[in-house]
Regions:
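Radical SAM enzyme core and accessory elements
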Residues: 164-169, 177-260
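Proline-centered flexible-loop/turn and helix-kink motifs
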Residues: 19-22, 52, 146-147, 170, ...
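Bilobed periplasmic-binding protein-like "clamshell/Venus-flytrap" ligand-binding domains
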Residues: 119, 149-153, 217-224
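Flexible glycine/acidic-rich beta-alpha junction loops that bind and position SAM and/or redox cofactors
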Residues: 38, 91, 95-96, 125-133, ...
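Short alpha-helix in the alpha/beta-hydrolase fold that links the catalytic acid
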Residues: 134-138
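Radical SAM [4Fe-4S] cluster-binding motif and immediate context
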Residues: 1-119, 125-127, 140
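Basic phosphate/pyrophosphate-binding loop/patch that engages nucleotide-derived ligands
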Residues: 140-148
């Protein structure tokens, strides 16, 4: 079973990293930091108690999101939550056994944005029941809720050895074991490994190409707009806070990745 680390012990390490090494940003890579409301609140209370000038991010689960919890996370330094949404179609989510519906996804993402936390919106394509229509739903969702803090792209589903999809692929004759997976099928995370949809491989790639072109064009259009606004601001308004066109300002200066 899974046993979460004690929140106070976790913050002992965060405090040491800040005091001894000047770390001001922590990335928790544990998939289960938000394993429950109680554990997440314990971590937040530990941050609150230490009152450290440290920002942090984590992986999150929309099952456990509430506006109150998100606000507590924001108030104690959380600036980014990486969500594994995977799909914006209820039939696809049901087949994946995600325990989520699109209504809950939308509510959770809207509340995350409302409290001022940036959400990571991770999508996959190629699960059972995926189609051109479900891909369009995913793209529409990503564009609507894009805060432009990251480039959003969609990757194909990968049936990693040991996962339920891996054994499905074996049973269906789409994979011939671990060696076939690593040597022949899983050549690149952006390329199709096993096609579980009713689309042909060419149609599958057409969907991915359209989706990612659309998402990246949307991102770079906004990026161009922001740069043009910066240029206007520095010269027309004499903005003294401007730090240079070649300076990539990042919230992750002094960044450490941790497991919780």
């Amino acid at each position: 079973g899974y046993r979460a680390r004690n929140a106070e012990a976790l913050l002992d390490e965060v405090e040491m990293l800040h005091k001894d090494y000047g770390i001001t940003y922590i990335s928790f890579q544990d998939d289960l930091l938000m394993t429950s409301v109680e554990h997440t609140e314990e971590v937040c209370r530990a941050f609150e108690k230490r009152n450290l000038p440290v920002k942090w991010n984590c992986n999150g689960r929309l099952n456990y999101c509430s506006k109150e919890l998100l606000q507590f996370m924001k108030d104690t330094g959380c600036v980014f939550i990486n969500y594994g949404i995977e799909a914006m179609d209820n039939e696809v989510l049901k087949r994946m056994k995600k325990g989520l519906r699109t209504e809950k996804v939308i509510q959770g993402i809207e509340e995350t944005l409302e409290v001022g936390i940036s959400p990571g919106l991770n999508m996959l394509f190629g699960n059972y029941a995926d189609s051109r229509e479900t891909m369009k739903k995913a793209v529409d969702f990503l564009i609507k809720y894009d805060d432009f803090s990251q480039q959003r792209t969609i990757r194909p589903v990968t049936p990693y050895p040991g996962s339920p999809l891996y054994y499905d692929a074996i049973r269906m004759g789409l994979l011939d074991g671990v060696e076939d997976f690593y040597e022949n099928k899983h050549l690149n995370s952006d390329l199709l490994c096993v096609n579980f949809t009713e689309l042909s491989d060419d149609e599958f790639y057409d969907c991915l190409e359209w989706a990612n072109k659309t998402l990246l064009e949307n991102y770079h259009k906004e990026s161009h707009k922001r740069v043009m606004n910066q240029i206007e601001d520095i010269y027309q308004n004499r903005d003294s806070t401007f730090r240079g066109f070649r300076h990539a300002a990042s919230p992750t200066t002094g960044h450490v990745t941790m497991m919780s």
